[in-house]
């Protein structure tokens, strides 16, 4: 059994997508980041960076005691190795999938995240910051579109690379992107959306968070919790 500490964000969706694809048994422990539940001591034992998702696997492959893992990329890699699925076994295919997963972790995710912040949540509309992150997100969409121009999925068969990237492309409108400019990304997006496991994963989001799909920031308290963090919150 896997305990999944989860909230309805792109990084959270990555893990439910994988778990639904493989049928691994898991239990969701909601961590409402708008209420500050990511700072609870019990959660910090699993996720010292006070970010979701995180998980505890009570039956690790080859292990004798439970293992806890945080960071969505590390979690995807762990789950792929545990199940032997969604990560090629051969050297070249394996590192192709891994490098594109890291591309999302180091590029698409952070840039799209800052894009969301300055376009949608920042109280002061700083045009330089908006342009900077909208343009960089646009460049990254271009990289992905080129990659998908001659293949169905990012790294051969459907893999953790696709699961890592997909949730960050779903909200393309909030990122100021015109999906029609990226036809290969659009086709890829529509293909993954129709997978039964993807449908189940996103259905989980609506079950866990009744406000899913609405603006993430609804009160000043939520704004303070999400955007006012300093080293003082590390306990």
Question: Residue locations for each model-derived region?
Answer:
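Short beta-strand edge/turn micro-motifs at domain boundaries
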Residues: 19, 197-198
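Short, solvent-exposed turn/loop segments enriched in Gly/Ser/Thr/Pro and often Arg
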Residues: 32, 160, 205-208
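Short secondary-structure boundary/hinge segments and terminal tails
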Residues: 36-37, 190, 209-211
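GST-like domain detector, emphasizing the conserved glutathione-binding G-site
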Residues: 1-131, 135, 145, 219, ...
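Acidic/histidine-enriched, glycine/proline-rich intrinsically disordered or flexible terminal extensions
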Residues: 205-235
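GST-like fold's C-terminal all-alpha helical module
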Residues: 79, 92, 101-197, 203, ...
